[in-house]
Regions:
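Conserved helicase motor core of SF1/SF2 NTP-dependent helicases
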Residues: 258-260, 268, 282, 358, ...
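Conserved P-loop NTPase motor core of helicases/translocases
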Residues: 200, 206-208, 253, 261, ...
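A helicase ATPase "motif cassette" and its flanking acidic/Ser/Thr-rich regulatory loops
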Residues: 1-81, 101-116
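Pre-ATPase regulatory/linker segments immediately N-terminal to the P-loop/RecA-like helicase/translocase core
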Residues: 2-14, 76-226, 281, 299-322, ...
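Conserved lysine of the Walker
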Residues: 244
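Walker A (P-loop) phosphate-binding loop of P-loop NTPases
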Residues: 241
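Hydrophobic anchor at the beta1->P-loop junction of P-loop NTPases
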Residues: 236, 264
Length: 659
């Protein structure tokens, strides 16, 4: 593909991204108008009412306000570093309706009761005329960056204040900016990579003897060497449980033998946290731009803010910043001496900031951030020889170009047979926005790709179906875990169809129920059976053994409404009380990158037409069925699901295992 053609392709990407931006913004607007605060609270998108804590200036001299969640503390929330938020108040009428709705919810055990009973008309919800940005979240405590002039609006409010997620304009604008830069690039490394990534021209390689890594398996060792040989691009394709992170950490370590510093990015904060933690465990000096999602002292110590505040010059800088703020508040005496003093203080503050940042960045070997975080002003003007992008198969191409503009070569790692990027616009999806940079390069530059071929997570029979269906049978199971299980003579995979299960006989089976655009679908009978089957399996294992060996469980459903209903059922069933810390309940997306000893999946869909909605996204199901180490239990109506060839093959595979 010529230079003109690569530019045309990226211009098309920009048009598709614009469609997605408009679709997501419109969907957010409609959701905000249609959904009451009570439903947003239950979805984890809002906290209300807040307890407002202290305000302070952070290391970037931004005003930060501490707020605390006071209700629904058992609800998993969606607030994390970098997300935009808006504060609001409710009228007395709105507060009264929330109270009534919560009472109704407790009575009928319905996860949508709040949503059905709380009106969200404009007269009841009063949004404050500014936005904030989440800086830090730890359980029910959140720190939000807010405009200093609006702090009193929150702190002195006579009525309770709440906070909810707002539409994320920043991420889109950052991606649009990245595309504009790469389209405009001429005669530089970015222009070279742009043209290379849209052509079949072979990527360039170094030539030197392969290195040995006896602690890695053969495909992992090959992947590390391919990364070291790559002048332009290398791709690590890591199916579930194959040690992708282990391989990347080794490759980063070896790269740092040749380069002074590398940039490591991922689509999500959680993935950045994970690889950063593994690098820290190997003794690498990591500087984390942004705050971690999982708060622990080890990782907090590697964040930019903590490093900045721990610097010996920070107390002096803090005192100067305070003096500047106090000087600005003076209403009298703003003469020439005032301006001279202000300029001296500003100059000294800038000098100290530069010195502190130079030392912090000079000491770090790895700079870690999300893809959007790579546009942070702290990185402005910084160049890297190599950028590593993990989760590359979950990131829009435009997002990958954000860190790419800072580097000479790129290492992509991920699995395009697992979760794809989320695209809400049907037109954008049809136009190809969902096809990632990694997926495209796998197609046109297969010699740059290394498939990791040995998995260390699952019983061989759990992995076999996924290996055959998605990876051409190339992924094998490590001998040491090939036949591990919880119980002797246990079948590692089972499928129960609610209407065909003897103990239910289908008599109390209600099938699927549609509960609104934002909640999706729910199947109460299947949810009850899911927990019944889990309880039966726990009884087979034995309570004491589960507690002693910390046997953990993941309960997965593709539908958020079913997840919420399952959480409620577990919290109300006394049998599971001793095991609460061992049981996680979440959507498929929420379990990406995780694993459990036991996984039980509630499929939800149950109709005569064989309609399965987004269960047709087989990459999502690949994630679901590959989370289990030793036991996988599937609950789903076979009459509905097996009309689709994938589920028919999966069901037949499981039946063959049963003999």
């Amino acid at each position: 593909m010529s230079e003109v053609s690569s530019i045309q392709a990226l211009q098309q990407q920009r048009l598709l991204l614009q469609l997605e931006y408009q679709a997501e913004k419109e969907a957010f607007r409609k959701q905000t108008e249609a959904m009451g605060i009570g439903r947003k609270i239950k979805r984890g998108d809002a906290w209300y009412p807040l307890r407002v804590g202290k305000g302070f200036y952070n290391s970037l001299n931004q005003y930060a306000l501490e707020v605390f969640r006071t209700t629904d503390t058992d609800t998993e929330h969606n607030f994390e570093f970098g997300k935009p938020v808006v504060f609001f108040r409710l009228s007395a009428k709105g507060n009264q309706k929330i109270a009534v709705a919560k009472n109704n919810q407790n009575k009928d055990n319905n996860p949508t009761a709040t949503a059905q009973n709380v009106d969200s008309s404009a007269t009841e919800v009063q949004y404050m005329k500014f936005t904030g940005t989440v800086s830090y979240v730890d359980g029910d405590r959140m720190v939000v960056i807010v405009p200093e002039g609006h702090v009193l609006d929150i702190q002195s409010s006579e009525t309770p204040v709440g906070v909810q997620l707002s539409f994320d304009e920043t991420s889109y604008q950052t991606m649009f900016d990245a595309l504009a830069r790469v389209i405009a690039a001429k005669g530089n490394r970015m222009a070279y990579l742009r043209n290379l990534f849209y052509s079949t021209t072979p990527a360039e390689r170094f030539s030197f003897e392969a290195m040995r890594f006896p602690w890695l398996n053969a495909s992992q060792e090959k992947a590390v060497n391919e990364i070291l040989w790559a002048k332009d691009v290398a791709i690590v394709h890591g199916p579930p449980g194959t040690g992708k992170t282990t391989t990347l950490v080794e490759a980063i370590n070896e790269t740092l033998m040749r380069e002074s510093q590398v940039l490591v990015c991922a689509q999500s904060n959680m993935a950045v946290d994970w690889i950063s933690e593994k690098l820290v465990d190997r003794g690498v000096n990591v500087l984390r731009i942004g705050n971690p999602t999982r708060v622990n002292d080890k990782m907090l110590g590697f964040t930019y803010e903590r490093r900045f505040e721990a610097h010996a010059d920070y107390p002096q800088l803090w005192a100067i910043r305070k003096a500047i703020r106090e000087l600005r508040q003076q209403k009298k005496g703003r003469d020439e001496r005032f301006h001279q003093k202000m300029e001296r203080l500003k100059s000294r503050a800038a000098e100290l900031e530069i010195r502190i940042n130079t030392e912090i960045f000079g000491e770090a070997r790895v700079i870690a951030s999300t893809l959007v975080g790579a546009a942070h002003r702290l990185l402005e003007g910084r160049r890297f020889e190599t950028v590593f992008i993990d989760e590359a198969a979950q990131a829009l191409e435009a997002a990958c170009w954000i860190p790419l503009r800072r580097a000479s070569r790129v290492i992509l790692a991920g699995d395009h047979c697992q979760l794809p990027p989320t695209v809400k616009s049907i037109a954008a999806l049809k136009g190809g926005l969902g096809k990632t940079l990694m997926e495209r390069l796998v197609d046109i530059k297969p010699t740059c790709v290394t498939l990791l071929q040995t998995q260390y997570r699952m019983h061989e029979q759990i992995m076999r179906f996924s290996s055959d269906y998605f990876y051409g049978g190339k992924v094998e199971t490590a001998p040491q875990i090939k036949y591990r299980g919880i119980l002797d003579y246990d079948i590692p995979i089972e499928w129960y169809s609610p209407k065909e299960t003897p103990e239910t006989d289908g008599s109390d089976h209600t099938g699927e129920t549609f509960v609104g655009d934002t909640y999706g679908r729910i199947n109460k009978g299947e949810a009850q059976l899911t927990l019944d089957k889990l309880q039966q399996y726990f009884n087979k294992i034995g309570k004491q053994r589960i507690l002693d060996e910390r046997i953990d469980v993941g309960v997965i459903s593709p539908y958020r409404a079913q997840v919420q209903y399952l959480r409620q059922l577990i919290s109300k069933r006394d049998f599971f009380k001793p095991f609460r810390k061992l049981i996680s309940v979440n959507t498929v997306d929420g379990f990406q990158g995780q694993e459990r000893d036991i996984i039980i999946i509630s499929m939800v869909r149950d109709n005569e037409q064989g309609q399965i909605g987004f269960l047709r996204d087989l990459r999502r199901m690949n994630v679901a069925i590959t989370r289990a180490r030793m036991k996988l239990i599937i609950l789903g109506n076979t009459a509905t699901l097996t009309k689709h060839p994938f589920y028919r093959q999966l069901y037949e595979y499981i039946q063959e295992l049963k003999g």
